[in-house]
Amino acid sequence: RNKQIKSGEVKQEALWRDAWRELKKPIVIYYMLVFSGFWFLFNALFDVLPIHISEWVDTSVIVTSLFGSEGTSNGILQFWLGLNNEGTKVMPEGMLNLNAGLIMTCCFIVAALTAKYRITTAMFVGCLLSILAFVFIGAFHAAWFIVLAIAMFSIGEMMISPKKNEFMGNIAPEGKKAMYLGFVMLPQGIGWGLEGYFGPKLYEIYASKELFSRDLLLERGMNSTEVSAIPQGEAFTTLVSYTGESAQELTQLLYHSHNIGMAWYIIAAIGTISAVGIFIYGKWLLTLQRAQQAA
């Protein structure tokens, strides 16, 4: 292409004009739209799930299963498993470390298994796995189910994330692969921007332990002035001391008296729209390629 520009065969224009022309192509527009939903899911995992685990998931069950009821005092295990200082429960960041650990150890296996499939097929299946993971998070709050959900999402991510670069490289016109690889980041930016606003809002509406605790304090007889005076983040501990009930009992009460999973089902629904879009996009692209080959 550089030789063609120098010889005058191809006229070079401003990069932004060239990029804008490519961005307006249906193949790029549809790509950005259908894959933004997956990146909404991806960001929700790291943005909202840690709060969900902290508020609703008893991760001490995992430690008890592995080391007994007293946990472990081994500093190395505490560090690598992301346990608290007492070694009795897994911290939210420790749970999410499973995602990074699986990607580091299993990405080449997933890549080998998906290599024989069309790129859009692999990404479609990966998106379905990610959606199922969020349904699991919404349906169950048992610690081991959350571990399973994170593992499922990680496999889905491994099927999508590396393939997106390969896909964009394949559909890029000659001499514009670098530009198209830059376009890969656009759906991520759209998904991140939308999730950054709507993800926490959904959680606040359907699953906020803080708000539910304040409501229960009012129901149990605390006046509204006292409830309003409770510092942000301390409503549940106030509820425990006010009622005299255990934190575990109150957590179960709040969980079962509210539809906590709805936030995750809505996020999964967004992913479902994305998965359907990926499927249709893949079929459309295949038809387009066959038409070009026939011509």
Predicted features along the sequence, with ranges:
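C-terminal ends and interior cores of transmembrane alpha-helices
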Residues: A111, L128-H141
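Intracellular loop-helix junctions on the cytosolic face of multi-pass helical membrane proteins
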Residues: R1-F46, P50-S60, A263, A269-A295
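Intracellular juxtamembrane helix-capping segments at the cytosolic ends
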Residues: M158-P173
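A membrane-interface helix-boundary motif in multi-pass transporters
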Residues: K201-T272
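Helix-to-loop junctions at the C-terminal end of transmembrane segments
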Residues: T105-I119
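Loop-to-transmembrane helix entry
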Residues: D58-M104, A111, N259-Y265
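Hydrophobic core of transmembrane alpha-helices in multi-pass small-molecule transporters
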Residues: A133, W144-I160
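A late C-terminal transmembrane helix in Major Facilitator Superfamily
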Residues: G175-A207
